[in-house]
């Protein structure tokens, strides 16, 4: 199988990846004595919970204590931890669900919608709580009723990724209005046929060589007191990741992690203390970062990698 075919298959698997969700209204926001019905959905890993708020508002409206609440007042939590709605669902799941990631040495690999043996240790669907009051403004960015905030944050992230890749960010700035609209429509509709042509333009700018690769690392962060430790705090780490290292050798996940987090990744070849998890799977340290960017990056062009401690 050619490298192009491998890339295409990986891209397809990642695009079709999803997480079954069971979303329930918080008891303090529910007007009935018993819990309201749960909202069940198979939601794309690449997408954003913020894109669900209007459907959830309509579904739970009959059960709300204050039915005239605005959709922008809704927010999600998991086991008491507010979930950042501008993080892709897959990243949130990898960070907080507690599910064991799939390892390349395991066989057979799970399908995009079927949990692996490791996932079975964490009950599915992933059970989230929807709130309509007490919005945690110190932890979450405020939403708006027209999805303008999530649109703006997404486009800003796309521009950041483009700036790192090209050094200018002009590829995004020079997109036509039609292309920019199509990119966002592809995100909202989760439509690969709309997304791929624009994504290929961003990844392959004419006459420009890639300079750096957009990678963000997310680490569990222990607070200074018990209260902080219980809030699922995460530290985001970012550094310039070159396309090549040494004598024009491709940058690998192992060399990048050894550069950015040498304490957790003292070896470039073997995971000793922590693992890099992307789309629910442990990333081999020998994997090329550029190839991952081209095949399995999130919709904004970034590799959002969860760092999971071993043992």
Swiss-Prot record:
There is a cross-link at residue 159 (Glycyl lysine isopeptide (Lys-Gly) (interchain with G-Cter in ATG12)). Keywords: Autophagy, Isopeptide bond, Membrane, Protein transport, Transport, Ubl conjugation. GO terms for biological process: aggrephagy; autophagosome assembly; cellular response to nitrogen starvation; mitophagy; piecemeal microautophagy of the nucleus; protein transport. It is found in: Preautophagosomal structure membrane. InterPro entries: Atg5, ATG5_HBR, Atg5_HR, ATG5_UblA, Atg5_UblA_dom_sf, ATG5_UblB. It is a peripheral membrane protein. Conjugated to ATG12; which is essential for autophagy. It comes from the Eukaryota. Pfam families: ATG5_HBR, ATG5_UblA, ATG5_UblB. One of its GO terms (cellular component) is phagophore. Residues 102-122 are annotated as: Disordered. PANTHER family: AUTOPHAGY PROTEIN 5. Involved in cytoplasm to vacuole transport (Cvt) and autophagic vesicle formation. Autophagy is essential for maintenance of amino acid levels and protein synthesis under nitrogen starvation. Required for selective autophagic degradation of the nucleus (nucleophagy). Also required for mitophagy, which eliminates defective or superfluous mitochondria in order to fulfill cellular energy requirements and prevent excess ROS production. Belongs to the ATG5 family. Conjugated with ATG12. This is Autophagy protein 5. It comes from Phaeosphaeria nodorum (strain SN15 / ATCC MYA-4574 / FGSC 10173) (Glume blotch fungus). The gene is ATG5.
